[in-house]
Every structure is written in C-alpha cells, then in structure tokens.
C-alpha cells in the first residue's frame, strides 16, 4: 500500500469515528465546559461595588449558585447584593457546600483576602479599607446558603 493511500484510509477512519461519536451524543447533551461557572457572576457582582449594586438584576447572581443549587433567589440594593439558595442533595452538608463556594470565590477572585474560614462563615475582602468590597458566604439555617457582597 502506498503512502498516499494509507494516509487517505487513516483520514477516512478518523472522520468516520468522529461522525459516529457525534451521532452518539444527544442533540442537547451537556459538555463539561457547559457547566455553569460562578466566576463570571462573581466578577460581575464585585465589579458593580464601586457604583452600587442597584444596577444588577436578580439573574446576575444566579451563576454563583447554579453549580450547587437550582433555587437561587437574589436581590440588590445600592449597598449590597445577596443570593440565598438550597444546596443540591449531592453537595453533602451545608458546611461542605459552603466550603465549595469559598473555594470558587478564592479561585475566581485571586486578589481577594480570605480572612475568615469557619464552618458556618466564609469572609473575603478586596481593596483598601476605605474602598473595600466585602464578600461573605454563610450557612442560613439547616439547609440554605447565603452570599452577600457589599461595598463602601
């Protein structure tokens, strides 16, 4: 078999396998990179702090909760933005889910200082004291989590 012919057969086989793989996935199948990322939502909320949070909509914060719960309820005032949600059953305890949220905050906002790390409360801040943005994640009762972002 000559080189050109074996090259064509290899390409045909690869294309066939790729086609079969594409057909095997349902049309609406989720991919790993389709999972909601809390980073965009966290960054959007924190970026609003200097001018006030009232410009944010309830939907703006739901991305923070989506990896962990489906019932996020978010609201904004001029001074703060908050979301409350119920963690999925597979998240384990509220304290375990809170630790996961704190890990996301730390990963998404590497300039944030993590100054409180306890089972019921995680606290971060960004900026100098006079212009500080506070990020607090807490357990809210037996099966709820609450995230509050506030600014000066």
Language-model features: locations:
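N-terminal leader/targeting segments
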Residues: 2-4, 26-79, 94-98
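Generic detector of solvent-exposed, compositionally biased contiguous segments
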Residues: 55-66, 115-129
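Short, low-complexity, Pro/Ser/Thr/Gly-rich segments in the mature regions of secreted, periplasmic
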Residues: 140-152
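Long, charged/polar, surface-exposed segments that mediate recognition or autoinhibition
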Residues: 69-121
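C-terminal segment of classical bacterial N-terminal signal peptides
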Residues: 17-29
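Bacterial N-terminal signal peptides that target proteins for export
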Residues: 2-17
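Short, exposed beta-strand-loop hairpins at the edges of beta-sheets
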Residues: 125-142
